[in-house]
Each structure stands twice: as C-alpha cells, then as structure tokens.
Amino acid sequence: MTVTYAHEPFTDFTEAKNKTAFGESLAFVNTQLGKHYPLVINGEKIETDRKIISINPANKEEIIGYASTADQELAEKAMQAALQAFDSWKKQRPEHRANILFKAAAILRRRKHEFSSYLVKEAGKPWKEADADTAEAIDFLEFYARQMLKLKEGAPVKSRAGEVNQYHYEALGVGIVISPFNFPLAIMAGTAVAAIVTGNTILLKPADAAPVVAAKFVEVMEEAGLPNGVLNYIPGDGAEIGDFLVEHPKTRFVSFTGSRAVGCRIYERAAKVQPGQKWLKRVIAEMGGKDTVLVDKDADLDLAASSIVYSAFGYSGQKCSAGSRAVIHQDVYDEVVEKAVALTKTLTVGNPEDPDTYMGPVIHEASYNKVMKYIEIGKSEGKLLAGGEGDDSKGYFIQPTIFADVDENARLMQEEIFGPVVAICKARDFDHMLEIANNTEYGLTGALLTKNRAHIERAREDFHVGNLYFNRGCTGAIVGYQPFGGFNMSGTDSKAGGPDYLILHMQAKTTSEAF
C-alpha cells in the first residue's frame, strides 16, 4: 500500500540550518563546474567533438559544463536502442516501473539542495525558485508513479451474459521528449517519467541552455534501476536532430514544452505520414502564454499589487504562466498601479547565489536582446513607470519593468515576451476586463482579484484559460493540486500533473471473451 500523495514541502530558508545546508551544496556544486557530460545511448556513454557549452547566465565567464551533442547518425542509434528496449520495457509490470520512479524521488529528495544549486548556477534561479523547481520534479515522480498504479487495471466496462469484456491501457512506443530551459529539472523530469512509467522508451533532448541538470537527472534514473535504452540522453541542434526525430517514421509521439513557433513547427511536421510509418503520431505540447491578472474594483488592493508583481517577475518573467499583462478596473487603476510600482522598486536584482536576491538574470544573450527590444517597443506603447534598464556586462540582467496605460491591442499586450516586463491596461468595467483577458491567441493561466462572488462565478465559465486563480497570482501550479496546461495556442490541452495526463502516453485496448 502506497502512502497518499502530498506535494514536496518547500524549504524554509528563514531557518538557519536550511540556509547553511543550501550554502554548502552551492559550494560543492561550484567544485563540479566544467565537467564533460557524454551522450547516453543504451547505457553507453558517448563523447563527441561537438559540445554545448553551458554557461552561468549570471556570469558569462563561468562554464557550468560541456555536453556532447548528437548528430543524425547518433540520433538514429538512440532510436534503435529505444526501439529494442521498448519490447521488454512495455512488458514490465506497472508496479516495477512505478517503483523506479519512487526510488528516483527518494534519491532526488536526498540530493535536493545539490540539484537546486545546479539550477541556481545553470538556469540563473534564485534559491526559492530553484528549490520549487526541484520540489516539483520530486512531485512528478511521486504523483505519476501513483497514477500508473491506479491505471494498471484499466477502466471498467460492461459485460453481457456469456462474455467478459476488459478495457486496459498499453504503451505507445518510442517518444521524443524536448524539454525547456525555464524548468530544466521539473518539466524535463515530468515529461520524461510520464512517458517512461507508462511503458514507453524515450529520446530526451534537453534545452541547449540547461543540459547539465538533465544529465545529472539521467544519472539519478540510472541509479534508481532504469534499464539501458529506456532513457537515451541526446542533446543536439534542433534543426539537425530535432526535425529528424520528429519526422522519423518510428517516432510514436512527441512531448514538447517551449515556444509557440517551435511547437507549431513540430505539430505540422509530426502530422505528415512518412514512408514506413504505421501510425499517426501523437503530439503533447505546452507552448506558452500571454497571461492576465485582472483586478476588480472591490479587490484587496495590496493583494492585487503583490499578485501582479510576483506573477510578472518571479524567475525574471521566464515562466509560461507569468502574468505579463494586468487589467485593472478604472475605479482603482491609479492606486493599484502606484502600489505595484512601489513594490517593484523594492525587488532585489542580482546574482542568484545570494540568498537575498529576488530576481536573477534572463537565460542567455538572445533572450536579453529580445526583452530589451520589447522594452524599446513599450516606450512607444505605454508609460514606463519602473525598470527599463539592462546590464549585460557580466550576466544578462534586466530590471523589472512596468509599462502603464497600454492599449489592449498593443504588441506588449499581445506578444509573449518571456522576460521581466508587465503591461498594464485600464478597463471600463468587468465585462471589459473579461473581453481583454480573452483577446489573445493564448489561453494558459489567469487570475482574478475580486470580492464579488458573481464575478468569480462568471470568470470561472468565461475566462478562457486552462489554469484560473482567484485572489492570488497566476503562477505556481502544484502537481496533483492544480493540473497545468492551457487552451488555444498555449498547447494541446494536456494537463501536466493531472489525472488524465498519463493516458496521453498510452492507447486503450478492448478485449472481449465469449464463453
């Protein structure tokens, strides 16, 4: 009998012992920098000449590690290894597969601060953000293991006299898992193990900006007893091996988290049936958002301001759930904007290794340049009230930036920026607020601050997002508590950490026996 699932507690860094322990882990990780991480194909460690050089976004001179990269020949080798491993892995009992996840969760829990420290160094995450990322990875392992145990018997169906009908789930085959930089442990681990625990084998292509933490997680899965060939680690260029694997006739499904542009490209290419392909490929995609915090006229205004600020600037706005738009009722607009600006100016921006840092850098030069471009656009679309400056002399730092009086159809209100920039718009009334909330091509997260029960119930039906929060910010979904995933161009309507997510990685089979 398994213990009932509960999410992994976050570390309380106000306790001196926790602060000390995390500092010691950071010191240890600093001694591990600059190592080489090979490909892992069928358990074989393969070094290649071409490397991804992972750098610290807070210190461009510091190299976190060197990850070998796969070409198409090695990607094909990984595909063949996964195909061979699938024949035996799919026949393993669900209990056995789940137990490997439980063991991996225990290992990760013991090494929690170590993995969080890698996230500080490689992803530029402040302590609390890094800790939450690692906790979420543990949650995915624990939750999906339990979900597989629930699904192992299939689902009940009716039987008539003289027959026995059964309905059960089978694995799909070989999957391609393409993970993002912004949750390089949690989302990478969650998408990988969801495929694995359901009996599939995978090729894992981690984000170019964060290959080291993915390599460390592969080590954890090996230690937990995962057989060779089930998880094949192949960093590489998206244009070279990404397209190759998405289009491969033996690929059964693609699990992708990232930008709208890349997600649409994958969806289109996966849809084309290749010579020798025996199925229609399944695509599981989460592709970002343009998420809105709504503030009603009777809201708690201090709560509203903090919800706007922390939703916009947590992890430098590099969350698909980030509240990059705020829509405020005209009756309280000036006061909420004033409070949000004042709170923003108290945020500390700096090296994420410092426990007092609230906001670290953006992930890399391309991101820095993109965000700074949008800040320039914002200067012509709204009133700059906070931030607007960047400094890339040592790392990729951008001050938390607020633009007010932005038109609802402006680029700042419509396009995903993925940085510490929030656009604020004034609404005439609640109807107008909802109209603006639904006027983008995305539909991932949203929040409504109000004391009006009728408005809450209306938003529950009419605010068209996959994750809607009332009287809090729009980030911070917890596995098993707030299953995560959105509508429209935010993805394929999958809900990570939810009761039906694993089923996306399986196919149902009906058997009927007459007697």
UniProtKB/Swiss-Prot annotation:
Q: What is this protein called?
A: 1-pyrroline-5-carboxylate dehydrogenase
Q: What is its EC number?
A: 1.2.1.88
| Active-site residue list | E286, C320
Keywords of this entry: NAD, Oxidoreductase
Gene3D superfamilies named among the record's database cross-references: Aldehyde Dehydrogenase, Chain A, domain 1, Aldehyde Dehydrogenase, Chain A, domain 2
Instruction: Give an example GO cellular component term for this record.
Output: cytoplasmic side of plasma membrane
Q: Which family does it belong to?
A: Belongs to the aldehyde dehydrogenase family. RocA subfamily.
Source organism of the structure: Bacillus subtilis (strain 168)
GO MF, one term, reads:
1-pyrroline-5-carboxylate dehydrogenase activity
Q: Which reaction does it catalyse?
A: L-glutamate 5-semialdehyde + NAD(+) + H2O = L-glutamate + NADH + 2 H(+)
Could you mention a single GO BP entry for this protein?
proline catabolic process to glutamate
Q: What class of enzyme is it?
A: oxidoreductase
Signals that turn on the gene: Expression is sigma L dependent and induced by arginine.
- Pathway(s) it belongs to: Amino-acid degradation; L-proline degradation into L-glutamate; L-glutamate from L-proline: step 2/2
